Amino acid sequence: MECSQEDVVNDFIALEKIGSEVDINLDGVIKSKECSNTNEADIISNLITAIEESLSCTSVCTAVSLETVAQKLDAYADPSLNTQMSFSTASDLSSMEQDYVKASDDPFDLNHQPSPLQVWRDQGKITGFQMMCDDQKVTVVDSLECLAQSEQHLEPVYFDPRVNLAIPCPPDDFEILEDYGSTSNASVNSDDASTAELGPTSEEFEEWVRKIEQNY
């Protein structure tokens, strides 16, 4: 059953405040005999089922539905949002985060405690974002990319079950992931499902971030 964006945001905030980490079990999806012979919609359907089963014990609902996925698969990509969610921007976000910490890290400023979600804006528009989990940078990837990445035994963690999965990116693995992302992004053609096509619109993403920031 599909739930509202507000419900997902509230559950996400509650989950972050208690410091929980939710693992998404994709073994059934990856090892499925039908996986190599199905189209994107079928893979996403199996992926949604895996997410729902993994999140059922944490009272975190996913608002992804087969209907919305079908619509997104046919949608045009949002280049700006696609850039925000690509591996190619991860190193830039990392350096930006260091600048942000130097400028605002004040342990005595109780009114401005750091949020697990860091957002950078230019003239009011989101130009980048980054999530931290247990002091590890969380790299956002496309769901289909996550299926391919799982062969490297990287463990997915919760970011936003409506849209994406995410993986913690240890420093030693970052160059490998960055190279993979650059290669996969370059090989995507206009008929393929991209991160942005499976993700929210720019307006939805702005609203989602705004609600999270209001709670910190």
Swiss-Prot record:
Biased composition (Polar residues): 182-193
The protein's name in its UniProt record: Uncharacterized protein ZK945.6
Origin: domain of life: Eukaryota
Segments of this protein annotated with the region Disordered: 182-204
